[in-house]
């Protein structure tokens, strides 16, 4: 019996290793988005639950870095998950890959990687992001999101913003600004995840798009934390 258990355990380890080797870099990146989202939600006084409930989409860009030492411009890739339905008021759907380029995180991140989390709060912000690449602060309004108990104090600020931004850094950190950055669909990365050519808007708009295995953790984390859209806009639709 012990031999059988040992053999079974070995086979499980081998299967896991084979699975890991087969994942391409974009599939691994999508898995990382789920891990980052879970870790961020575990931080005390971070993203207020009421804001996550009212969001239509969540974008996670892990490990954003400066392009070069002394240059503010940054680059990162990640994924966006939106609620299903024409008005984005259903359960969380399949992920689409996105890229963040340009702009400046300044000296706030130094040489360290920074994880970014963006909440898309209304239809205007969502339509802008789905249409094409968006310059944050110009094509879509963006503001640093309130944390924990600060949510009520900053109500006016986040109600006006189409996108709220949060960050987590493993090194010294003094805040983050995403104005001037460009957010765009990364359709080539989505193709690597889904195994076929597909655009971000088609992924998000589809009611029947299946969630790839590497994206299930990301979707499940959001579904468990904020299963329903509790915004006034959604409740009136």
What are these regions (language model features)?
Residues 4-14:
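Sec-dependent N-terminal signal peptides
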Residues 15-21:
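Sec/Tat signal peptide C-region and signal peptidase I cleavage site
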Residues 21-237:
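Small-residue-enriched, tightly packed secondary-structure blocks
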């Amino acid at each position: 019996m012990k031999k059988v258990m040992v053999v079974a355990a070995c086979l499980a380890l081998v299967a896991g290793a084979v699975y890991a080797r087969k994942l391409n870099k974009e599939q691994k990146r999508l898995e990382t988005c789920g891990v980052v989202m879970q870790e961020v939600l575990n931080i005390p006084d971070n993203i207020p639950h009421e804001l996550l409930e009212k969001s239509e989409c969540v974008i996670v860009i892990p490990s954003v870095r400066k392009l070069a030492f002394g240059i503010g411009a940054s680059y990162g890739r990640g994924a966006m998950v939106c609620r299903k339905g024409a008005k984005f008021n259903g359960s969380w759907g399949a992920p689409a890959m996105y890229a963040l380029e340009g702009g400046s995180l300044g000296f706030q991140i130094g040489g360290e990687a920074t994880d970014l989390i963006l909440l898309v709060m209304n239809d205007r912000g969502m339509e802008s992001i789905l249409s094409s690449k968006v310059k944050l602060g110009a094509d879509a309004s963006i503001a640093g999101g309130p944390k924990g108990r600060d949510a009520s104090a900053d109500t006016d600020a986040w109600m006006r913003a189409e996108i709220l931004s949060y960050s987590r850094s493993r090194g010294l950190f003094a805040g983050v600004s995403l104005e001037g950055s460009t957010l765009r669909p990364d359709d080539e990365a989505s193709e690597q995840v889904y195994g076929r050519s597909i655009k971000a808007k088609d992924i998000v708009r589809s009611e029947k798009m299946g969630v790839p295995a590497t994206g299930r953790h990301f979707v499940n984390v959001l579904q468990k934390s904020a299963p329903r859209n509790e915004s006034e806009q959604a409740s009136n639709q």
